[in-house]
Curated annotation (Swiss-Prot):
<comment type="similarity">
    <text>Belongs to the SIKE family.</text>
</comment>
<keyword id="KW-0175">Coiled coil</keyword>
<dbReference type="GO" id="GO:0090443">
    <property type="term" value="C:FAR/SIN/STRIPAK complex"/>
</dbReference>
<dbReference type="Pfam" id="PF05769">
    <property type="entry name" value="SIKE"/>
</dbReference>
<dbReference type="GO" id="GO:0005737">
    <property type="term" value="C:cytoplasm"/>
</dbReference>
<comment type="function">
    <text>Physiological suppressor of IKK-epsilon and TBK1 that plays an inhibitory role in virus- and TLR3-triggered IRF3. Inhibits TLR3-mediated activation of interferon-stimulated response elements (ISRE) and the IFN-beta promoter. May act by disrupting the interactions of IKBKE or TBK1 with TICAM1/TRIF, IRF3 and RIGI. Does not inhibit NF-kappa-B activation pathways. Associates with the striatin-interacting phosphatase and kinase (STRIPAK) core complex, forming the extended (SIKE1:SLMAP)STRIPAK complex.</text>
</comment>
<dbReference type="GO" id="GO:0035331">
    <property type="term" value="P:negative regulation of hippo signaling"/>
</dbReference>
<feature type="coiled-coil region">
    <location>
        <begin position="70"/>
        <end position="102"/>
    </location>
</feature>
<protein>
    <recommendedName>
        <fullName>Suppressor of IKBKE 1</fullName>
    </recommendedName>
</protein>
<feature type="coiled-coil region">
    <location>
        <begin position="164"/>
        <end position="192"/>
    </location>
</feature>
<dbReference type="InterPro" id="IPR008555">
    <property type="entry name" value="SIKE"/>
</dbReference>
<dbReference type="GO" id="GO:0031267">
    <property type="term" value="F:small GTPase binding"/>
</dbReference>
<keyword id="KW-0963">Cytoplasm</keyword>
<dbReference type="GO" id="GO:0019901">
    <property type="term" value="F:protein kinase binding"/>
</dbReference>
<comment type="subunit">
    <text>Interacts with IKBKE and TBK1 via its coiled coil region. Interaction with TBK1 is disrupted upon viral infection or TLR3 stimulation. Interacts with CDC42BPB. Interacts with SIKE1 which mediates association with the STRIPAK core complex composed of PP2A catalytic and scaffolding subunits, the striatins (PP2A regulatory subunits), the striatin-associated proteins MOB4, STRIP1 and STRIP2, PDCD10 and members of the STE20 kinases, such as STK24 and STK26.</text>
</comment>
<dbReference type="GO" id="GO:0030674">
    <property type="term" value="F:protein-macromolecule adaptor activity"/>
</dbReference>
Amino acid sequence: MSCTIEKILTDAKTLLERLREHDAAAESLVDQSAALHRRVAAMREAGAVLPEQYQEDASDVKDMSKYKPHILLSQENTQIRDLQQENRELWVSLEEHQDALELIMSKYRKQMLQLMVAKKAVDAEPVLKAHQSHSAEIESQIDRICEMGAVMRRAVQVDDNQFCKVQERLAQLELENKELRELLSISSESLQVGKESSVAPASQTIK
């Protein structure tokens, strides 16, 4: 019976070590999520600068067209989508860690229940104290993981809302860019017609 108790204590320590590893992995996921949030925020700030460029003089529009802003906007849109997908994958991974922790805790409780059934033949007080200590720490770690999961869920929801706003802004900027290009084209055509009109009378005068 003492071997069974020692085995349960050993299993409990092993489960606790696995729990700590899962906790470290969860913290790493949270750090990665925070880094993604910073990258998305930086891209949104970069996108906010674009409207100022569209408000410059018409003479600058021609120079801006060399950089193909609609392509840049499309690239930023794709990058934001990738960041959103990566963030969701991190959140799913965190939930998988949480499920694993709950499974570990369930197995641990089952082992302790088996011990309690057989405790009549042995003084199980030392084991019960060890169980209480390990159980409290495991419950604390699970609570932390649950809190991390809740934070990441809220972050994903906020990112979804911000992403919709960014998409709307990008569509607006693309429309403005199209209109500016049309104005530039009309202006260029008018200038060309004016030059041709001035050249024609001059040619007739020379004759």
